[in-house]
Amino acid sequence: MEGRKEMLMYLEGGQLGTLVGKRMAHLSDAVGSPMAESQDKLVPKSPRAGPIAPTDRAEESEVEVGQATGQQRSRSPQLRISSPHPPAHSDSLSTKGQHSSSDTESDFYEEIEVSCTPDCNSAASDYQQHSAGQCSEPMGGSPVNGSDSSKGGGGSHGSFSACAGDQMRRYRTAFTREQIARLEKEFYRENYVSRPRRCELAAALNLPETTIKVWFQNRRMKDKRQRLAMTWPHPADPAFYTYMMSHAAATGNLPYPFPSHLPLPYYSHMGISAGSTAAATPFSAPLRPLDTFRVLSHPYPRPDLLCAFRHPSIYASPAHGLGSGGSPCSCLACLSTSTNGLGQRAAASDFTCSSTSRSDSFLTFTPSILSKSSSVSLDQREEVPLTR
């Protein structure tokens, strides 16, 4: 009996060594270990091993089948290898192998149920984005699909940023002509609209109140840009200024008619009487204080020096076209028609000037004058420092 127990201990120790060695080396085959072969060679040397050999062989085959099944199911990297404790009997060893294989199988299926593939993540994120309009990053996967879950997380992060960009995107409102005309009329009446008035406009125009508010903000900025463009440092070419004003009035951007031959903002500094203003302009009442082009006042303290902007009824004289001492006039109107003769120049020009009221040291300093330097001598193009 002692010899039989000793032989069983040898067999169990060899089989446990084979199991641990093969689990550490991740071998797919359960047979072929040199230690198992040595233990098999030791079996026939025992005189009492003959009668019990079939039983031992059956137990060995059962254990080896359990080992092979356990190793095939334990390919997941989450399998934890613990140091085995040698049992007292081979039956307990076989039952332990079966329990470990069943535990590994259950863990493996649990991991499959928990983990998610990148296709799963992208499909879930797309579904959430289209159904609920919100994007959320999925939870991290199990260590089995660690790299895949990280890739899926990156894709979901990209879709999250794209979703945020779509939510922040603002679409431009297409206004109808009737809506724009009504808003322009209201803006002409008052630049800043109160909230009750905005609500009334929104109800009348079938627009959101926020859209009305944003439109008035943009319109005020546009008005500010137009003022700065016309007043810095001063209109370079009065003809261009007149053309722009006439074009704006013709296209409907100005809520009032504009006479093409009268740059009105410059006449407010020249002391024009009410009768002459009413006779020369179609306005029956002064412009409102916050008018779009009302602030186009000239920045210079002596606007009467700019002969190109003088009113014909005030400064017209028979000596037009001649400066002091008989020198030719250098105003814009005279220079623009210098090739047509003196008489035709006085009749065709929109702006007339009088050389007697113009200082001898001042000449109109505009790009249109400098571009026609061939018709003006050097002594007549003196530059005067501008007073700020």
Swiss-Prot record:
It comes from the Eukaryota. The keyword DNA-binding applies. GO terms for molecular function: DNA-binding transcription factor activity, RNA polymerase II-specific; RNA polymerase II cis-regulatory region sequence-specific DNA binding. The keyword Transcription applies. Residues 30-109, 131-163 are annotated as: Disordered. Signal peptide: none annotated. Residues 68-81, 91-103 have a biased composition (Polar residues). CDD domains: homeodomain. GO terms for cellular component: nucleus. Its main location: nucleus. GO terms for biological process: regulation of transcription by RNA polymerase II. Keywords: Developmental protein, DNA-binding, Homeobox, Nucleus, Transcription, Transcription regulation. It is found in: Nucleus. Residues 168-227 bind DNA. It holds the Pfam family Homeodomain. Belongs to the even-skipped homeobox family. May be required for posterior development and development of normal embryonic axial pattern. This is Homeobox protein XHOX-3. It comes from Xenopus laevis. The lineage of its organism: Eukaryota, Metazoa, Chordata, Craniata, Vertebrata. The gene is xhox3.
